[in-house]
Amino acid sequence: MARAASGRLAGRTILITGASQGLGRAVALACAREGANLLLVARRAGPLEEARAEAESLGARAIAVAADVGDASEVERVAAAALDAFERVDVLVNNASELGPTPMPYLIDTDPDALRRVLEVNLHGPFLLTRALLGPMLAAGSGSVVNVSSDAGVVGYPGWGAYGVSKAASDQMTRIWASELEDTGVRVNSVDPGDMATAMHAAALPEDDPAELARPEDRTAVFVYLASAESAGVTGRRFEAAAFPVPGAEPAHAQ
């Protein structure tokens, strides 16, 4: 199917990691409805292909690349595939996340290899992918990088050690990227999507009733905003998706 000819993201190319399910898939479909080209990345090829097909059914041009963003060589392959297919990426959404072992152990009981794996996916991968795609953004004088955050990176919840440390570091990396890229036209922000009915939330907090949690598709408005021209000049900020009012509106709350 031909891609959508109009929309707030028409003509923009967006790369989304962790796009096979949950928030990543919901953001991909929201961007597809707004006319974006998509490059979708996730580890599992089957669900990723389903997400790609669904995006194309909405009129988007969508390409799927099965890869593990916690592996530096695979990050290089993703970046090469993106630049080969689209020449440049306008928007990067670093959404892929690794929770770590469950039930979630206290730091004193955390295996060092498990901590390393969480940091590779949640911090090292986004750093490498951002760096790999930054050149064409700088040459064009525009671009948007969105890192998915969590309140576990702000509050010291017991048992959330590996994940919380990775998200705290990700927020700081967002601020530093934004400062270093000031006045280049490339903006870097983070979004805390809040509690949602996702597989990751179920793994972390199996006692929670998913019917009482937000759906991922209800938390996509801020991502479309940050991917669009409406957010030009907005950088170095931390948004709470639950507080973002309507598509295209100014955020109700940002930090």
Predicted regions and their residues:
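Substrate-binding pocket helix/loop in short-chain dehydrogenase/reductase
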Residues: P103-L107, D111-R116
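Active-site helix of classical SDR
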Residues: T130, S166
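Conserved glycine-rich cofactor-binding loop
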Residues: S20-Q21
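The beta1-alpha1 cofactor-binding region of Rossmann-like NAD(H)/NADP(H)-dependent oxidoreductases
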Residues: G46, A66-V78, P112
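Alpha-helical segment proximal to the catalytic Tyr-Lys
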Residues: G135, A178-E180
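C-terminal helical subdomain
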Residues: D183-T184, S190-P193, T198, E207-H253
